[in-house]
Amino acid sequence: MYLRKIKLANFRSFQETEIELQKDLTVFVGENNGGKSNAIDAIRLLTIPLGGRREIYCEGTDIRFQSTRPDFEIVGEFEELSTGQQGRLISAATDVSLTRAAFGLNFSADRLGARPTLWAGKDGNTPEPGCHEMIRHVYLPTLRDAKRSLASGNPTRIMALLTHFLDGSSPAELAKDLARTQSHDVLQKVDGAVDKGLQALTSGVRRQTASLGFASDEALVDIARDLRFKLADHGVDPEDLRYSGHGYANLLFMATIAVELEKVRTADLTLFLVEEPEAHLHPQLQAAVLSFLRDQAAHSRSSPPDDGSLAGELQVVVATHSPNLSAWVANERLVLFKSVAVPVPPSDSEKAEPEPQLADAAVIESSAASETSSPGELKEGVVDATMTAAAMRRSTRVIPLCQLPLDDGERRKIDRYLDVTKAALLFGGRVLLVEGIAEALLLPIVAKHHTLKSHPEKLRLFMSTVFVPIDGVDFAPYIKLLLTSINDARIADRLVVMTDGDRAVDEDKDEEDDGAAQDEINESAGVGPSPISEDNGESALVREEVAQALKREEDEGDTQAKTVDPVIPGERRKKEFDDLATSLGGIDHFRAITSIYSLETELIEAGNVDILRNVYLDLHPRSRRKWDKAVALSGDARAKAIHKIFKTTRKGDFAQMLAKRIEDGEAFKVPAYIGDAIEAVVS
């Protein structure tokens, strides 16, 4: 059995929402204030804590703010009930096969002292005694200081562990066995010394005697209060927790919970709800935590009972902000939470006042978008933005990635990309997709020092954008991922794709010039180039070769004009991406931008020959003739030559060195398509 779906109506930030969960592990991801903790709390309210003691209760403040309804509802749908579970949860069954069940919680605040109403199967149906207790939860909050939670004076965790290992004995018997001795010589000496003075003080009235020792009626909880965990690297004597870091203390705390879950078979299903398990952990430990949680869930289902007894199954739900954790699981297990602005119902709009947070945000956004406006226009824009905020309200939308229209190949491609790059692809409202690392490195520098240099608000917006180099031109899976609308929401608020035009670049692999390739090999090995002298004779040779190349270019131009497809590869891709965005209903959130040639050629065409020549020769100090020969050409011939010499250039190194020269203030002109892409992101 597992929780397949949780439905929320009018609960906190949710209007009408369904959250689909996976059988063993589901990861809630998304922005701050997106509603992840609200969903976790909904599960906590619907189910009973494993320890029996509730920490949260239904309150009037759980009802959606400014809602016209005075109530909320939480419904959990469960699937794949075993035979024994079908019998125990028969009153909650929702189909004739008895393999599905549901529990619901209604709460209304329209009367004083209102209490939640629990139903099973369908609204109004009271669950049989003990039926609801078969589904429990364990809540692990964000651990900011696990050392304090495990420290002396807070016996909760240690007491729970001791209780689960009683193995038939009682807490009183264990306390008796753990009782501390009071017969030590030092204690007796203290008794004698104190008793001598006490006798002198009390013998004239009523003589007293004293004894120093531990409480004779010491309970197990008192002993647990004095027990302390110690921790250290393997092979080193454990030390007090105060000498350990927060991260490993968090893992120790999590391990104590796992022991408790392993030992308990008092429920058919236990939901392990974990918030921000990445707290205080470096990436490798975050991966270990996620693997541990997944293994715990799998282990709980590895040996189901064959006698119809309680199954003790475990289902894990994790809420996180960590790109590392979201990248280490298959995307089908991810549920994205997103906060969107929705209109106020008509019945409320006339009397609703602007929510302070929305009004403030509207003013800030209006100001950021009006840097060049006059004072009068700016004031009018702020007023309009504030009035718009009065008619809007924040609402949580969820996007289960398992519902995205991706085939298996596309899903695996996205999983592999996220696993390798740990990109914050799922956390950014604005996303810029580019072909390779060179564009991803250069665009922020170009925006900062040129395109958005005079627009600080736009620059801040651009710098918060997620830059995604996909190392290719197959953008379609990422466009589907980011623009598909589920529950009236999509991952990306703004998506820009920048792709090369690739005119004059053969789609098939170019034949390498053997001499040039040998020069590259020699250069990498520190050996001299092919024997060509760098003198005036070489210059004459270069001029002759350039003249011949120009003649060939002219002849080839006439032929290509008749035979080449007038639509260049970049334009074909742009049309495909625009059509895809339109089919997904996200064209208003999308912009595809292409050039005519490749990145390097476009940089040259924009007038950056000198700065690019310096960078290229820094990387290839023996290739001056090759560079001059290529740049001396024009049009498609130059594009082919530039493409050819850059095929043996390390793109990342090239972009890094060019970025440094731009930062140092060397003359640089921004290619039009790069400027358009930067502006499109912040528009």
Name the predicted role of every residue range.
Residues 40-96:
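Conserved P-loop NTP-binding catalytic core
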Residues 496-643:
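Activity-critical C-terminal alpha-helical subdomain
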Residues 149-152, 159-274, 295, 301-304, ...:
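Extended helical coiled-coil dimerization/tether regions that scaffold
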Residues 608, 615-618, 627-683:
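Terminal low-complexity/disordered tails
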Residues 1-48, 230-421, 663-675, 679-683:
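Switch/communication elements of ASCE P-loop NTPase nucleotide-binding domains
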Residues 48-71, 267, 299-312, 338, ...:
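Flexible phosphate/Mg2+-sensing switch loops adjacent to catalytic phosphate-binding sites
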Residues 82-173:
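Electropositive, glycine-dotted interaction segments
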Residues 422, 427-509:
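Conserved helicase/translocase motor-coupling segment
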